[in-house]
Amino acid sequence: MPSAIIVEDEVLAAERLRVLLEECNVVLLNVFHHAMPALEWLSVHEVDIVFADIGMPEIDGLEFVERIKRTAKRQPEIVFTTAYEEHALRAFELAAADYLLKPIKMTRLQTALDRIIEKNREKADSFTHFKVYNRERMVEIPWQQARYLMAEHKTVYLF
């Protein structure tokens, strides 16, 4: 199942989403009530999905997404939560995977999760080549030709 964090300044809304995510068997790694600690956490941890309020007080959704792109260890899917339906279009303009209207309904949450899981499955199925840097140039090697990988310190060897 996917892993997630919640970034929501409203404590009750965060708690409601936490309960729903647990019911959907999502591995909840952390809950943040401010954007800055979440961004710091994302710079050193990996997560599949970030559920974030589109209207956080310290930074708006656009700034939050831009900072994630600059600082996150791995780019997660973003699902914005909002109390206003008119913010839905804005969520997609911000390259969100989906949006959820508050109060969040279980069926709508499950639909969003199913879409993200399917999208990630398609990405995994489309993997065809390793991209390997070989003396200043990149070489693509079909994954079927790789016999094994060996990691040593900060280097990975492909055989």
Residue map of PLM features:
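CheY-like receiver
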Residues: 36-124
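Conserved RecA-like P-loop NTPase ATPase core
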Residues: 17, 88, 146
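Conserved binding/recognition cores within well-folded domains
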Residues: 114-159
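Extreme N-terminal starter segment of soluble prokaryotic enzymes
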Residues: 1-3
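Residue-level signal for beta-strand positions within conserved beta-sheet cores that form or flank
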Residues: 25, 74-75, 128
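Two-component/phosphorelay signaling modules centered on CheY-like receiver
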Residues: 10-33
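Short acidic capping loops at alpha-helix termini that bridge into adjacent secondary structure
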Residues: 28, 75-77, 145
